């Protein structure tokens, strides 16, 4: 039995230099599991000639109700006016966003026999960022080298991928090493109660009937032909047409690693072929803002879901004159963000400019790159 939904009256507050700004008619706070950093855009009303004491590079916190959901920096504070309205639009992103476009620099550029949290801490420490470990990070990495000109985000994601860890950022702006969907949110998505609108966002465009990975090994216990011709394959039984995909693993690999790669690819692409975007009333559920990376129960007979728990992988909280305060939730099966220790990365060129930190190979360009 699902408890009856009761709408909360939460407010979004922007806290800059100790001053809380709230009570506007438009706002947007966007967080996504595939982007390392959250973003915000909020116009603040002002009296002409008396602009608020907010400037670029100021530290900022975004609160929904009493809960901090984003800690970052102001990137723009631009004035605007029109008939009957005057204000300043404040836009920015969470602290970890600094890693997206900046280069990774570390003395020597190499680590030996180091765990991934040490590698990642060394990369992000110059940016003033902390690292929070929320999962098992596995054994040490024997050798890790920075690529020349490699971005800090790419280096962090590559290190995490070696041990099957998902990289995101938390509400305090720290880099978070975690897994997908380890917690369940107390709220539910219920058609006829808190749902305003829903649309399906799934597609089989990126799925294949069989995934075939090839690689080479320098294992001295194997004969030459075995080492040269490692191969693993996995089938997606739901794809009935002949749609094979070959993945070429760069660098030294093993049979077990190739098998992990193809099975992981099946799960992730299948998970990403399914999804829904829900618009729900309000910004919170029983006083708690809708969270990222938690499972949520969905009761929707149109979607064919009766209590199934899907992963919240996108949260956008908005306010406008038409809809009031609403939250857009993107949900997918948890397996869409499955993680597994991988040396090989299948390149993706459709990430946009926010940076991708997920541990899965999918996308339009499926040539493998060494990790």
Residue ranges and their predicted role:
Residues 1-104, 164, 190-197:
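Assembly/oligomerization scaffold segments
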Residues 1-5, 85-87, 94-99, 133-207, ...:
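Short beta-strand-centered interaction patches in the first periplasmic/extracellular domains
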Residues 18, 40-42, 74, 92, ...:
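Amphipathic, non-transmembrane alpha-helical segments in extracytoplasmic/periplasmic proteins
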Residues 22-53, 196-371:
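An acidic/polar, Gly/Ser/Thr-rich interaction patch typically located in mid-to-C-terminal regions
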Residues 75-83, 181-183, 309-321:
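Short, compositionally biased
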Residues 100-106, 187-190, 323-324, 340-345:
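Short, charged, solvent-exposed linker or helix-capping segments at domain edges/interfaces
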Residues 101, 176-178, 213, 298:
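Short hydrophobic/aromatic-rich beta-strand segments that constitute the beta-sheet cores
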């Amino acid at each position: 039995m699902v408890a009856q939904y009761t709408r909360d009256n939460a407010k979004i507050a922007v806290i800059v230099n100790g001053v809380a700004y709230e009570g506007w008619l438009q706002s947007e706070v966007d967080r996504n599991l595939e982007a390392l950093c959250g973003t915000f855009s909020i116009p603040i009303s002002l009296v002409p000639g008396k602009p608020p004491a907010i400037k670029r590079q100021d530290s900022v916190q975004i609160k929904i109700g009493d809960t901090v959901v984003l800690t970052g920096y102001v990137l723009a504070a631009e004035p605007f006016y029109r008939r009957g309205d005057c204000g300043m639009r404040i836009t920015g992103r969470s602290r970890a966003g600094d890693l997206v476009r900046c280069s990774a620099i570390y003395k020597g550029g190499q680590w030996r026999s180091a765990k991934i949290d040490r590698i990642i801490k060394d990369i992000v420490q110059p940016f003033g960022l902390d690292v929070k470990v929320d999962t098992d990070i596995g054994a040490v990495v024997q050798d890790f080298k920075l690529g020349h000109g490699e971005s800090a985000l790419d280096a962090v994601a590559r290190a995490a991928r070696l041990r099957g860890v998902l990289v995101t950022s938390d509400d305090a702006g720290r880099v978070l090493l975690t897994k997908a969907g380890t917690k369940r949110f107390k709220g539910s998505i219920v058609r006829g109660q808190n749902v305003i609108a829903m649309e399906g966002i799934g597609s089989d465009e990126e799925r294949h009937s069989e995934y075939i990975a090839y690689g080479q090994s320098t294992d001295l216990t194997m004969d030459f032909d075995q080492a040269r011709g490692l191969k693993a394959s996995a089938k997606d039984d739901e794809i009935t047409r002949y749609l094979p995909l070959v993945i070429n693993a760069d660098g030294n690999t093993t049979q077990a690693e190739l098998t992990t790669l193809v099975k992981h690819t099946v799960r992730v692409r299948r998970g990403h072929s399914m999804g829904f975007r829900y618009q729900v009333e309000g910004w919170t559920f029983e006083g708690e803002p809708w969270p990222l990376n938690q499972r949520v129960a969905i009761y929707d007979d149109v979607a064919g879901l009766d209590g199934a728990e899907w992963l919240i992988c996108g949260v956008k909280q908005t306010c406008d004159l038409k809809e009031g305060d609403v939250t857009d939730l993107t949900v997918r099966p948890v397996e869409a963000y499955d993680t597994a220790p991988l040396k090989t990365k299948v390149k993706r060129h459709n990430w946009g400019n926010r940076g991708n930190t997920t541990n899965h190979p999918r996308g339009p360009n499926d040539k493998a790159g060494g990790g």
